[in-house]
Amino acid sequence: ELCETVAGLMHAEKGAILYKKENIVGKSPREIIKMGISMSFIPEDRLGMGLVASMGMTDNMLLKSYKNGKSPFINKKPARELALRLIDTLEIVTPGVTTPVSRLSGGNVQKVLLGREIESEPQLLITAYPVRGLDINSSYTIYDLLNEQKKKGVAVLFIGEDLDVLLELCDRILVCLLYTSPSP
């Protein structure tokens, strides 16, 4: 829920979330973008919230950029080129850019999602359990991508459970605990 709240997908009951001294609580993703904050969100549910499972890589690339077009027609060529570049640079194993992403392994699905989101050059990258269920090689690829973003000055909000990973990747760690008092 923390990631969704920061991304503007859920409303906070109280408090403030400041990004560059601007309170973003209660703002929709569109309003946050209008404030000049470019962000990307890697949700925990990769195929439910992040990508459209029945679509191929090219069409999933378009989800982030189709509104930027100047025409009512969609030019798929840049999205296809991006998909091919991501396959090459992230070593995504897929039969092709039109293969539904639901047919890819979990690690490859995560590479598609993270690659698309990083390509938009966000100032803020929000990730929820980005390596959950992935093999060790895919996990290290994801860690490397996140570290590259951090080196570029991107603010990375990393939600995770593995303390060793958190200590290695994070500059600051916040421990959150949901506590409800027992009923009498």
Question: Can you annotate each of these PLM segments?
Answer:
Residues G160-E161:
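H-loop/switch region of ABC-family ATPase nucleotide-binding domains
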Residues Y179-P184:
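Conserved small/polar residues in nucleotide/adenosyl-binding loops
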Residues E119-Q123, Y129:
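A short, proline-enriched helix->beta-strand linker immediately N-terminal to the Walker B motif
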Residues Y140-K152:
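Helical segment within the ABC ATPase nucleotide-binding domain
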Residues R172:
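Short, glycine/charged-rich "phosphate-handling" switch motifs in NTP-dependent
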Residues A128, D135:
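ABC-family nucleotide-binding domains
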Residues L166-E168:
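A short, surface-exposed alpha-helical micro-motif characterized by mixed small hydrophobic
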Residues G15-I24, I33-I37:
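Conserved ABC transporter NBD signature motif
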